[in-house]
Amino acid sequence: EARWLRGEPQGLLDGVPVTIKENIATQGDPTPLGTAAVPLVPAAADAPPAARLREAGAVMVAKTTMPDYGMLSSGLSSFHPLSRNPWDVSKGPGGSSAGGGAAAAAGYGPLHIGTDIGGSLRLPASWCGIFSLKPSLGRIPIDPPYTGRAAGPMTRCVADAALMMQVLSRPDARDSMALPWQDIAWGDFDQ
């Protein structure tokens, strides 16, 4: 708060709560990939999306659930209880970014990040009534790189997703498939 009072916020997201899908490493936290089958070893470093969010001052409030290895279009996991759609708990939130979709729809905060190979951002968006974006492969650097997997924002409005893209699309040398830096006017996409 003192930084804001001085007019010196840490970055675009200083103090803004954010959730991150559990397959994106955050330093000191395990990365269970939605399954009870992997050992819970704390991550040594933040993956690029988590690093960019921290650098911008975001406050990470939770890791969000996903199905085992992200291989279902539901919130069913051997590690977590079943994720539910907050609009109708008899239904699922879609997946594999199930927890992020449910968290965004329930208003757990304004900013959430998930990943997508075959609909994992887009299904929760349509099933939970939120906005998400699966950017082009490499637009948001990710580590470890995986062909076809993209990280992307999950929000309740386009303007918040555009704000996240300004932060998440910054370069990171750990992703060999990252696209070259482009100065995209993400803020123009909320018009």
Where in this protein do the model-derived segments appear?
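Gly/Ser-rich catalytic/binding loops embedded in alpha/beta enzyme cores
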Residues: E1-I117
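Flexible domain-boundary/linker segments
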Residues: D14, G70, S120, M177-Q182
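Short, hinge-like loop/turn segments at secondary-structure boundaries
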Residues: S78-P81, C128-S132
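A short helix-breaking turn/cap at a secondary-structure junction
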Residues: I130, K134-Q191
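Residues on a specific face of well-ordered alpha-helices
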Residues: A51, A98, A106-G107, L111, ...
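Structural signature of FAD isoalloxazine-binding scaffolds in flavoprotein oxidoreductases
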Residues: R122-W127
